Amino acid sequence: MLDSVASKPELAELLTLTKTEQILRLAQINVELEPLSAQERVKWALENLDGEFAVSSSFGIQAAVMLHLVTQEKPDIPIILTDTGYLFAETYRFIDELTEKLNLNLKVYRAEQSAQWQEARYGKLWEQGVEGIEKYNKINKVEPMRRALKELNVGTWFSGLRREQSKSRAGLPILSIQNGVFKFLPVIDWTNKDVHYYLEQHGLTYHPLWEEGYLSVGDTHTTRKWEPGMSEEETRFFGLKRECGLHEDDGNEQDGSGI
């Protein structure tokens, strides 16, 4: 079935095109990737897209799915974490647990200034409205991620975003180009039920805060526990934003939990 997917796309050539031209050029490949399983998509990407390869993970609620899925095919693939210094204690323990359980090749990137230095210089940016949140995300998520992609010489970036998670992700394709590299989303069409079954099947767990009512987990100061009547999007960034920037294509980027 993998052989039926269109021929290997050339990143260097695609980078000479406009964004619209890139989308059109990759459209047929995306059509042919849609009916494949997530495992088949990962295999196709590893065989046909530019390396080096890497996975970005926020080690959020469903992070174990993507980490397990890709490392089953490429055990030594770098796992990029952008650490803000404000993650939950449970998240740091979850990182340690999954790193040991899956033998992850974890690469941690941080902002050039410490969290304390940033607060001294700018105040609490996350309390300064959308503009403050975007500046915070640029410093703590976007810049470290771009540095990681460059230093690791990444040609293809795997991420666990899913269309079901938010309106901003609903129209995303499996394969695109972002920050000058291929962006590949093998579980983009998975439902929460698909995620649950995969975790059960492979003896994996949700983030520990799942049991306490969290649907999405990021920094302690911009993550809220889900309450009746709230959408998943409203549990992050006070409902002002869904994305932290890592997955937005205009240079401000989009993360949040992904997987």
Curated annotation (Swiss-Prot):
Reactions catalysed: [thioredoxin]-disulfide + sulfite + adenosine 3',5'-bisphosphate + 2 H(+) = [thioredoxin]-dithiol + 3'-phosphoadenylyl sulfate
Catalytic residues of the enzyme: 244 (nucleophile)
GO cellular-component term (any): cytoplasm
Intracellular or extracellular location(s): Cytoplasm
GO function term, MF aspect, one: phosphoadenylyl-sulfate reductase (thioredoxin) activity
Gene3D superfamilies referenced in this protein's UniProt entry, alphabetically: HUPs (3.40.50.620)
E.C. designation(s): 1.8.4.8
Annotated Pfam families: PAPS_reduct (PF01507)
Top-level lineage group: Bacteria
CDD domains assigned to the protein according to its UniProt record, in alphabetical order: PAPS_reductase
Any Gene Ontology biological process: hydrogen sulfide biosynthetic process
NCBIfam families: cysH (TIGR00434), PAPS_reductase (TIGR02057), PRK02090.1 (NF002537)
Job description of the protein: Catalyzes the formation of sulfite from phosphoadenosine 5'-phosphosulfate (PAPS) using thioredoxin as an electron donor.
UniProt similarity note: Belongs to the PAPS reductase family. CysH subfamily.
PANTHER family to which the protein is assigned, alphabetical: PHOSPHOADENOSINE PHOSPHOSULFATE REDUCTASE
Protein name, as recorded: Phosphoadenosine 5'-phosphosulfate reductase
